[in-house]
Amino acid sequence: EHNPSQITTAAIAGRMHLTQGALFRHFASKEAVWEAVLAWVAERLLARVDQATRDVASPLAALEAAFLAHVEFVVLYPGVPRMLFGELQRAEDTAAKRTVRQLLAHYGERLAGLVEAGKAAGELTAEVGTDAAVAHFIGTVQGLVMQSLLAGDPRRMRAGAANAFAIYRRAMASAR
């Protein structure tokens, strides 16, 4: 609804039906609130990706399931990208930034495992660098996010997700 940097602790407390004092009994500062929110985001996004990729028939199908789960997460929680991008613009190294770095590291590990499994199964070309494949995957999601932010409609991500992943698949797939 708002630019995260413009959201006051009074507004946060009001939305949570708390007093500002009650909010500060749980959080030492506004930055601590953002850190907790981003930790919640990280936990939920990774759980959603894990659930989506569990028991999927192949590594490439699991990558697609992860991609679609990530897109759906952003559609359900459209404030998350605004908060992330706002926080990442800050010059100082904040606890929230560290939480985002941890999220990307854990997410990247999951994706790298799927990419390596895809190479081993012959679904993905062996020539593709794993780190590059992971960066391209995350960058493709981020591109959809940026387009949806510009359009002011997070649901646009759903419409573009299948085509975006199809391009990713063609770039990474083994010729077999």
Give residue ranges: language-model regions:
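Secondary-structure edge/capping motif, primarily at the C-terminal ends of alpha-helices
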Residues: A52, L88, S148-A151
